[in-house]
């Protein structure tokens, strides 16, 4: 955002005597400070001259320019707004004011100021970005057509590609510019950032190294390096990369401090999230998403939903997270509407051209079919990236359910037993599906042991019902009878007696057929005696008679 220098910024023939000159100390010229990008020094010089009455024309514009490049947008705004109130205000001031509004997030004001400026490439680039902010595709394409094959315009286009998740298109532009301008080192950071977004973390590191060799203390580059380490290794390795930043970040670079604090929360697995992330929600875009993830991990689905419900998703990550939150809330509330919204979000991402062949895209399609209960389709997608998630508990949980739901309970059992998370292993969905797998795989005793480890609750009652009914269907009458016996004691429902009676008769038949040990009859009689039904005595009499005839001790 360079200001026109049609009028000299320093020394227009007016000579002033300065006491410090007499002492032989040379005051630096504004041009020298600007060429060195010493914006703090430039502001100091301009304010000093203003204070001693040596203020020159356009001083306020130069202060605004320097403040803008220091990231002090409020100060820049103050200077530019004052400049627009002057007579014969240069129309170029309006585009500088508009850029300042833009960086303050005041997009409506930025657009109004931008249209007051004279037409220029900078004005077009600004309006191009505003059209993206407003999701106005018609205006976006209109300003896109005005872009020229010059570096600034092409960088602006690459930026829009990046923000629209068109990372490869952005990379192509950056690489083309770098071919002719090797000195534009910072473009390597942009390329590395694109590769990071494409999940090519090792490639991102290689490209980033080119820049860090020349600028080893770059805040943005070191932060990106830390993020790559987080993805490639773990949070501890990433935190080590940030240590030098935490030690050296200047007090004036407040955004860097906020970025570091934000990323440390992520690297530490959410530690300190409630203290750090809420104030950053409207400062760092990812802060809102990471706070939502934190709430989900704490099982606070309602808070997660409250934080994301008004967010209009524009990136795959935002669509995915809205899908996850709606799915979780739908399950918690039994809401079909939320489940349908989740399914639509997942389908939108998984079916998009840019995401369909990525792992997140395939995860979305698996989730979509999971919600539709089309488990054969779920497995097609899960199998396509299974090798990347062998030790991932969440993947194994979903994979096991899909396998069990399609009747492959043997592989379902294997996947369930790979899960390490104690929280997940105590979840009723896990317990009920694993119990079902055990029963279908002719291991009813293991299913019964799952129940014995549970405390008395509504969930343990439900698991008893599952064991009782599924064991009955599978002809595993002994554990079916035991389950129906406990159910009958907890709830004198006639249906439980009928189930228990049928299971006991089933065991008796299996004993007669030699498919069950004769000693089991003693326990069957014990189960029957615990019921006060009139049919019990008749059943016991028949069983005792058979036992006597077959010399079975009861």
Swiss-Prot record:
Its main location: other. TPR repeats lie at residues 57-90, 92-125, 151-184, 468-501. One of its GO terms (biological process) is intraciliary transport. Gene3D superfamilies: Tetratricopeptide repeat domain (1.25.40.10). It comes from the Eukaryota. Changing residue 444 to L: In BRENS; uncertain significance. Keywords: Cell projection, Ciliopathy, Cilium, Disease variant, Protein transport, Repeat, TPR repeat, Transport. It is found in: Cell projection, Cilium. GO terms for cellular component: centrosome; ciliary basal body; ciliary base; ciliary tip; cilium; intraciliary transport particle B; neuron projection. One of its GO terms (molecular function) is intraciliary transport particle B binding. InterPro entries: TPR-like_helical_dom_sf, TPR_rpt, TTC26. Signal peptide: none annotated. Belongs to the IFT56 family. It is linked to Biliary, renal, neurologic, and skeletal syndrome: An autosomal recessive ciliopathy with multisystemic manifestations including severe neonatal cholestasis that progresses to liver fibrosis and cirrhosis, postaxial polydactyly, hydrocephalus, retinal abnormalities, and situs inversus. Additional features may include congenital cardiac defects, echogenic kidneys with renal failure, ocular abnormalities, joint hyperextensibility, and dysmorphic facial features. Some patients have global developmental delay. This is Intraflagellar transport protein 56. It comes from Homo sapiens. The gene is IFT56.
């Amino acid at each position: 955002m360079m200001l026109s220098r049609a009028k000299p910024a320093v020394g227009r023939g007016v000579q002033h005597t300065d006491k410090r000159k007499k002492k032989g100390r040379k005051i630096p010229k504004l041009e020298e400070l600007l060429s060195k990008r010493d914006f703090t020094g430039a502001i100091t010089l301009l304010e000093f001259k203003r204070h001693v009455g040596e203020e020159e024309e356009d001083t306020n514009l130069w202060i605004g320019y320097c403040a803008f490049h220091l990231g002090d947008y409020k100060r820049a705004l103050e200077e530019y707004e004052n400049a627009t109130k002057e007579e014969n205000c240069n129309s170029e001031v309006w585009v500088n004011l508009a850029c300042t509004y833009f960086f303050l997030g005041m997009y409506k004001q930025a657009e109004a100021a931008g249209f007051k400026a004279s037409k220029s490439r900078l004005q077009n680039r600004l309006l191009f970005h505003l059209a993206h902010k407003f999701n106005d595709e018609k205006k976006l394409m209109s300003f896109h057509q005005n872009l020229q094959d010059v570096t600034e315009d092409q960088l602006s286009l690459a930026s829009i590609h990046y923000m629209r998740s068109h990372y490869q298109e952005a990379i192509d532009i950056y690489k083309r510019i770098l071919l002719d301008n090797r000195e534009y080192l910072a473009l390597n950071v942009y390329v590395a950032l694109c590769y990071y977004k494409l999940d090519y973390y090792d490639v991102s590191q290689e490209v980033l190294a080119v820049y860090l060799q020349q600028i080893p203390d770059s805040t943005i580059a070191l932060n990106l390096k830390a993020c790559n380490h987080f993805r490639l290794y773990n949070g501890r390795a990433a935190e080590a990369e940030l240590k030098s930043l935490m030690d050296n970040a200047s007090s004036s670079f407040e955004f860097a401090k906020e970025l570091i604090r934000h990323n440390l929360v992520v690297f530490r697995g959410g530690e300190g999230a409630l203290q750090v992330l809420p104030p950053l929600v409207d400062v760092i875009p990812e802060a809102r998403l990471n706070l939502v993830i934190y709430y989900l991990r704490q099982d606070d689905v309602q808070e997660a939903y409250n934080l994301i419900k008004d967010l209009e998703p524009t990136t795959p990550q935002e669509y995915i997270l809205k899908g996850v939150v709606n799915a979780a809330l739908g399950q918690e509330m039994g809401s079909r509407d939320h489940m349908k919204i989740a399914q639509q979000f997942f389908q939108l991402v998984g079916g998009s051209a840019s995401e369909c062949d990525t792992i997140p895209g395939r995860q979305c399609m698996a989730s979509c079919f999971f919600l539709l209960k089309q488990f054969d389709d779920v497995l097609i997608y899960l199998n396509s990236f299974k090798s990347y998630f062998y030790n991932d508990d969440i993947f194994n949980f979903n994979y096991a359910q899909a396998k069990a739901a399609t009747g492959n309970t043997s592989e379902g059992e294997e996947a369930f037993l790979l899960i390490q998370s104690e929280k997940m292993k105590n979840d009723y969905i896990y317990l009920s599906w694993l119990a079902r797998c055990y029963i279908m795989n002719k291991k009813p005793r293991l299913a019964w042991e799952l129940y014995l480890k549970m405390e008395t609750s509504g969930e343990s009652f439900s698991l008893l019902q599952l064991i009782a009914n599924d064991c009955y269907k599978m002809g595993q009458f002994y554990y079916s009878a035991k389950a129906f016996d406990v159910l009958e004691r907890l709830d004198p429902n006639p249906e439980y007696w009928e189930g228990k009676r049928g299971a006991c008769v089933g065991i008796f038949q299996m004993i007669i057929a030699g498919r069950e040990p004769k000693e089991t009859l003693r326990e069957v009689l014990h189960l029957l005696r615990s019921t006060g039904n009139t049919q019990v005595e008749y059943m016991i009499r028949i069983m005792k008679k058979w036992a006597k005839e077959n010399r079975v001790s009861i």
